[in-house]
Amino acid sequence: MRSFFVSVLAASLLASAACAASARGVPVPSACTAAVNARLSALIAGDDAGPVDNVMVCGTTIGPSRVQRGGPHGDHQLLPLRIPLDGGRTALVEVVTNDSLDGRVTAPRGAAVFAYGQYFHTSLRQRPFVAGIHDVHCATHRGADDGWVVVNGTKFPQRSCAF
């Protein structure tokens, strides 16, 4: 029985190391423009059901962040953004952070936010938001880069993603 647990632990560590080894760090853009949101804009326009890894978003909070309590993955913070799109258009997008994996990330109204993580399609219950970005933390599955969120120049997670 002990050897079974050791085998499972070793396999888990190898899988985590492989995921971390394949994940890459993506730099934060120097300015928030429609070009930063181009991939997200295409996903929104195509009504993509998602999820889609490695998507960037930037914008300004339209109100303060709010907490989403509990659940199987702990507390989350919801950051409501207005993002610039091509042609002077805008969209409302929600960035979701995980207190356990990212630290407690909050933002006041009017905060500049950049995030990189996994796109998800919103439900009618989440309107007026047309999309969301979550998994803005170190990669937890194969194919995902290390995610992050930046609020008014402060980057989260604040620890390195390297093992």
Question: Where is each model-derived feature located?
Answer:
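Positively charged n-region of N-terminal signal peptides that target proteins for export
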Residues: 1-4
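Bacterial N-terminal signal peptides
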Residues: 7-16
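OB-fold and OB-like single-stranded nucleic-acid-recognition modules
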Residues: 21-163
